[in-house]
Structures are given as C-alpha cells and as structure tokens.
C-alpha cells in the first residue's frame, strides 16, 4: 500500500465542517494539525477515538495543536455525532473520499476477516509549514489519541 511520508508537504484540501462551512488545511495551519481519518460516525471504534481526542482537547491545545477528524459522513451526521458524544474536535465531511485518497487513507482493508474498500484509520501530524511530521496508518482506536499526544 502506498503511504505518505514524513517530510512531505501535506496535501491541501477544502472540506465542509459540521456547519457547512468550507475549511482548507491552510486555514488550520496557525497551529499544528492533528488530522485523523475514521470510517463512520456513531460506530464503536470511531466513537471511542473521537471521545478520546475530545477528552484530551486541552492537552492538545497546550501543545499548540488543533484536532480535526475526517470521515465520509455528511454535515447532519457530524452534527448528531458531536451532540450525542459531546465532542469538541472539528469534524469535516469527505463524502467523495477525495481527501482520504490524497492522504492514502482509503483503500483495501480487512473487516471481519474479509477484504473490502474503505477508510483506513489513519492520523497525521502536520506542522505550521504544512509538512508531515508523523504518519500513523492502520491504527487501533483504543489508546491512539494518547499516543498521538505523546508524539507532539
């Protein structure tokens, strides 16, 4: 599987947030960006990961980082997810999976013993110059947010 590499310029994107406002990577680069791709709102692993990132929100802020989650869900789904789980991370809509493809976070993966196409749970730390500092592919949701925080 092809992957992005540390030291590369992070691919720019323009996606809508849960309020329908378009946001690009460049809009976020006043801080380090923790960009995480996840498969679907309101599913067990994705909920755990989002809640963990939200619980550590102030710790990420202390390290001058903003946390942004991206999935193929629409704005309405994100709004519901944010409300139900009391999330404080930014969620962006990648319904056509263009951003996931740019970040090599969409492709073949195993689910319940079968291979299928889908979002590959991945996280990227991007510095204020837009350069990839860390790339995590095929991550497990449990404990991942803490691991990312420790990597900053």
UniProtKB/Swiss-Prot annotation:
Domain of life of the organism encoding this protein: Bacteria
Catalytic activity of the protein: a hydroperoxide + [thioredoxin]-dithiol = an alcohol + [thioredoxin]-disulfide + H2O
One BP annotation, GO: cell redox homeostasis
InterPro entries the UniProt entry points to: AhpC/TSA, Peroxiredoxin_AhpC-typ, Peroxiredoxin_BCP/PrxQ, Thioredoxin-like_sf, Thioredoxin_domain
Listed EC numbers: 1.11.1.24
Record Pfam families: AhpC-TSA
- Disulfide cross-links: 46-85
Q: Where is the active site?
A: 46
Keywords noted in UniProt: Antioxidant, Disulfide bond, Oxidoreductase, Peroxidase, Redox-active center
Which cellular components does GO assign to this protein?
Answer: cytoplasm
Query: Subunit composition?
Result: Monomer.
Q: Tell me which family the UniProt entry assigns to this protein.
A: Belongs to the peroxiredoxin family. BCP/PrxQ subfamily.
PANTHER family for this protein: AHPC_TSA FAMILY PROTEIN, THIOREDOXIN-DEPENDENT PEROXIDE REDUCTASE
**The protein's role, per its UniProt record:** Thiol-specific peroxidase that catalyzes the reduction of hydrogen peroxide and organic hydroperoxides to water and alcohols, respectively. Plays a role in cell protection against oxidative stress by detoxifying peroxides and as sensor of hydrogen peroxide-mediated signaling events.
What additional remark is attached to this entry?
The active site is a conserved redox-active cysteine residue, the peroxidatic cysteine (C(P)), which makes the nucleophilic attack on the peroxide substrate. The peroxide oxidizes the C(P)-SH to cysteine sulfenic acid (C(P)-SOH), which then reacts with another cysteine residue, the resolving cysteine (C(R)), to form a disulfide bridge. The disulfide is subsequently reduced by an appropriate electron donor to complete the catalytic cycle. In this atypical 2-Cys peroxiredoxin, C(R) is present in the same subunit to form an intramolecular disulfide.
List the protein's name.
Putative peroxiredoxin bcp
Organism of provenance: Helicobacter pylori (strain ATCC 700392 / 26695)
Origin organism lineage: Bacteria, Pseudomonadati, Campylobacterota, Epsilonproteobacteria, Campylobacterales
């Amino acid at each position: 599987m092809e992957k992005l590499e540390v030291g590369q310029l992070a691919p720019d994107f323009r996606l809508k947030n849960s309020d329908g406002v378009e946001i690009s990577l460049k809009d976020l680069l006043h801080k380090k960006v923790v960009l995480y791709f996840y498969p679907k709102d309101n599913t067990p692993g994705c909920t755990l990961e989002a809640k963990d990132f939200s619980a550590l929100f102030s710790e990420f802020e202390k390290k001058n980082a903003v946390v942004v989650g991206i999935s193929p869900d629409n704005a309405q789904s994100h709004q519901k997810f944010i409300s139900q789980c009391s999330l404080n991370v930014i969620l962006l809509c990648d319904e056509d999976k263009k951003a996931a493809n740019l970040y090599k976070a969409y492709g073949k993966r195993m689910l319940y013993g079968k291979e299928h196409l889908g979002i590959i749970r991945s996280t990227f730390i991007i510095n204020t110059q837009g350069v990839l500092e860390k790339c995590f592919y095929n991550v497990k949701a449990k404990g991942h947010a803490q691991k990312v925080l420790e990597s900053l």
